[in-house]
């Protein structure tokens, strides 16, 4: 039978079926791996051979068979499946396993319009040969299967209509480096390209989706996050909508500040008409956000911000829930509700909160961000002024409505605007921060546009990347990595294009970066400490202190070479004020760890040279790019040892790093008794991080009486986060049991119930709904 059947190769030629060839490829993929079996994969794939079967179909069946065998007991199948998938991918891209010469590849891709022509203008064929010398294509074999699927789905340059792929991962990494360092002097740039290539291809620095998929192509917009503030005029609202459309079409996630829009029934033109209120304009923004899919990489998404004291707040808080009718709901945006000290004080004193339309209370909206004492003075004054339209509501009722909607939708976020402005690299009197972004980790100044080309408006962009904490052996490692990350991202600001002048001006003036971390849960497990019991507090304090210190040092060094950013005078750094001076002192009760770095020397250097970047750090979610590095997501605890990720590119399994050695050290999300320990760690990180943190709150109703989380508990966590200086809260996760997919391997472990529930979990990839401000 073996003789009669033939296979159809990729080039269309037919040859006799050779089972030995298939066996050799599978055996090659299993080499050196622990507890995997080539014959097991062959049995599992039970290929139905027929005459003329495509070799491509055989290959895909084998890959799927290996991927299906990934489990806690045999995590190495994720590497076996990955090797088979890499083999397949290279055959698709190059027609063979061996990658071509880099210079030939770049030339061909530029001719086909898939790479940016500047690559050939900036580098000679000899220089590409030099890069070829240090490219290590065997690093492809360090990817897990989940990583290869992400590369294929999101990152590699391809034709998204036909599905053809044109490159493999090492070319991606080296060409990103070549693009970012192209303008460096010829005598130093090759060394930077090599160092940056090594850092990214060895997963020490993790890059965000827009950079991985876009740098080297002709589309030049790589800022993950865009923050746009609207004014209260129709012109400004229209300008905001057009800016949203421009940025959504170019892979960015959007934060919209709509807090200035006046309330329903406000007079227009001295009462000639009355205002339709916020909801029709929110709907307009929602339509703008959903108008484009982000370069085929993900669907558009936005978070919209407004203050808790807005007159329409009771109608705004329910916009996302599934009750109500189409007219009074705007469900496809996420929302960020803004709080400050006075709001919490009214709650604690069981007092009332008074709601106003921002248009009726001159100066109040601006003071809400820029000056807390002035806000309180005006607020009380307006409360007593009988001529002003207002509504009083018990603080506990309003907070309870907020928490109820946050809990039921999971996607109503919170920003403490006083912490955001008091503990900030910007001087709030000249550059207040009035909003955050899609995922709540960015805090940058914005100004409304009056028309889309308004040079006086300010749209904030943030360019992201992250350090993989799993690769940090000593805190001095941050020195080299911070230097590379800051240099590369700073170059990117000059390299990219800006569809809106207000974004170009803001970026050139402030040069804001947001560098975060991935693999935090693995870092804790590796050091034998936990989220829940305070054992990690000292380590986290030392780690984030070192990270911020070396990032600032890198930015000072860059300022020596290239000059400080033009609006450096609007930062608190220019006044000699550091994050270590302005953090919330209540934190000292949680962590008394002394400072380890030489902050005085850094302060002196900043005074002398300034800094190249107004901001340097932000802790973002990293669902996608942490899969590339086979790391845990951002600062989050894993939900299970094996996660099954579902996205538009299919379903993949990923096992937590070093599972076999560290399984007893990992603390899984639903085994953590409360939010207290996690919030304390977030507070410690926030002491050093100059922007903010995508911090989540998690609740398991099964731990409470009658299976319901008491409102008292929700409000306690809210107040505790405020007390620790937490600036923002992102998702509210509720354990519903549905994500704890009991799998057959979990059944074997049922004698240990907690572990059984933790065995495999399904994690929805909400990257399609957003994820632009993730990395």
Where are these regions (language model features)?
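Core nucleic-acid recognition elements
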Residues: 1-3, 13, 36-174, 178, ...
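A glycine-rich phosphate-binding loop feature that marks nucleotide/adenosyl-phosphate handling sites
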Residues: 44-45, 63-65, 79-87, 199, ...
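Terminal amphipathic helices with adjacent charged low-complexity linkers/tails
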Residues: 77-110, 339, 420-451, 513, ...
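Active-site cavity-forming subdomains of large catalytic enzyme subunits
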Residues: 88, 95-137, 223-469, 473-474, ...
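Catalytic alpha/beta core of large soluble enzyme barrels
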Residues: 124-151, 440-446, 489, 493-494, ...
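Function-dense linear segments that define catalytic or interfacial modules
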Residues: 157, 164, 171-189, 193, ...
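Internal maturation/activation junctions in enzymes
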Residues: 217, 482-504, 508, 530-622, ...
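Short acidic, low-complexity intrinsically disordered linear motifs used
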Residues: 759-775
């Amino acid at each position: 039978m073996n003789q009669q059947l033939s296979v159809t190769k990729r080039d269309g030629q037919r040859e006799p079926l050779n089972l030995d060839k298939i066996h050799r490829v599978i055996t090659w993929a299993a080499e050196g791996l622990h507890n995997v079996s080539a014959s097991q994969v062959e049995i599992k794939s039970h290929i139905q051979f027929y005459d003329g079967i495509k070799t491509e179909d055989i290959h895909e069946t084998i890959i799927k068979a290996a991927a299906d065998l990934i489990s806690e007991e045999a995590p190495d199948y994720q590497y076996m499946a990955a090797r088979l998938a890499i083999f397949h991918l290279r055959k698709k891209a190059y027609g063979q396993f061996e990658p071509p010469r880099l210079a030939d590849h770049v030339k061909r891709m530029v001719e086909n319009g898939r790479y940016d022509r500047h690559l050939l203008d900036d580098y000679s064929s000899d220089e590409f040969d030099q890069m070829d010398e240090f490219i290590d294509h065997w690093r492809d074999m360090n990817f897990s299967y989940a990583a290869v699927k992400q590369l294929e789905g999101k990152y590699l340059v391809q034709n998204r209509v036909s599905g053809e792929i044109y490159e493999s991962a090492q070319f991606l990494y080296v060409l990103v480096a070549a693009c970012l360092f192209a303008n460096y002097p010829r005598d130093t740039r090759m060394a930077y390209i090599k160092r940056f290539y090594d850092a990214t291809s060895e997963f020490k620095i993790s890059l965000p989706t827009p950079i991985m998929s876009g740098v080297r192509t002709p589309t030049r917009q790589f800022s993950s996050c865009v923050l746009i503030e609207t004014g209260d005029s129709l012109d400004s609202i229209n300008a905001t909508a057009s800016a949203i459309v421009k940025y959504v079409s170019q892979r960015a996630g959007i934060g919209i500040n709509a807090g200035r829009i006046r309330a329903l029934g406000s007079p227009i033109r001295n009462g000639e008409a009355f205002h339709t209120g916020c909801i029709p304009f929110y709907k307009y923004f929602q339509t703008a956000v959903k108008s484009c899919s982000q370069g085929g990489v993900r669907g558009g998404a936005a978070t919209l911000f407004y203050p808790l004291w807005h007159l329409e707040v009771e109608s705004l808080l329910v916009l996302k829930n599934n009750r109500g009718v189409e007219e009074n709901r705007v469900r496809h945006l996420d929302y960020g509700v803004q709080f400050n000290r006075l709001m919490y004080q009214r709650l604690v004193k069981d007092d009332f909160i008074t709601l106003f339309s921002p248009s009726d209370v001159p100066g109040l909206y601006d003071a809400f961000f820029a000056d807390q004492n002035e806000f309180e003075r005006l607020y009380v004054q307006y409360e007593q002024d009988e001529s002003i339209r207002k509504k009083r509501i018990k603080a506990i009722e309003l907070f309870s409505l907020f928490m109820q909607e946050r809990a039921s939708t999971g996607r109503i976020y919170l920003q403490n605007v006083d912490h955001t402005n008091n503990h900030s690299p910007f001087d709030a009197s000249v550059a207040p921060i009035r909003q955050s972004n899609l995922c709540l980790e960015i805090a940058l100044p914005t100004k409304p546009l009056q028309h889309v080309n308004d040079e006086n408006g300010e749209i904030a962009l943030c360019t992201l990347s992250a350090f993989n904490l799993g690769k940090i052996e000593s805190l001095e490692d941050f020195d080299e990595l911070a230097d590379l990350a800051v240099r590369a991202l700073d170059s990117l600001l000059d390299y990219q294009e800006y569809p809106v002048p207000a974004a170009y001006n803001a970026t050139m003036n402030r040069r804001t970066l947001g560098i975060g971390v991935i693999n935090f849960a693995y870092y804790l497990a590796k050091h034998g400490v936990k989220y829940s019991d305070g054992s990690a507090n000292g380590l986290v304090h030392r780690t984030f202190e070192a990270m911020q210190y070396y990032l600032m040092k890198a930015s000072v060094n860059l300022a020596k070479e290239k000059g400080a950013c033009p609006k450096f005078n609007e930062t608190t750094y220019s006044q000699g004020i550091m994050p270590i001076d302005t953090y919330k002192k209540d934190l000292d009760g949680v962590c008394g760890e002394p400072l380890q770095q030489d902050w005085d020397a850094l302060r002196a250097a900043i005074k002398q040279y300034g800094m190249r970047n107004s901001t340097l750090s932000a802790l973002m979610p990293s669902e996608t790019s942490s899969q590339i590095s086979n790391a845990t997501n951002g600062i989050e605890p894993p939900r299970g040892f094996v996660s099954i990720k579902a996205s538009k590119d299919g379903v993949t399994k990923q096992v937590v790093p070093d599972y076999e050695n560290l399984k007893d050290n990992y603390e899984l999300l639903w085994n953590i008794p409360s939010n207290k320990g996690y919030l304390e760690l977030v507070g410690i990180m926030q002491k050093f991080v100059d922007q903010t943190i995508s911090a989540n709150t998690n609740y398991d109703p099964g731990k409470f009486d009658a299976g319901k989380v008491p409102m008292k508990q929700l409000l306690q966590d809210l107040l505790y986060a405020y007390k620790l200086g937490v600036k923002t809260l992102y998702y509210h996760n509720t354990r519903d049991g549905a994500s704890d997919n009991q799998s057959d391997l979990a059944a074997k472990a049922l004698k240990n119930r907690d572990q059984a529930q933790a065995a495999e979990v399904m994690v929805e990839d909400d990257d399609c709904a957003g994820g632009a401000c993730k990395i």
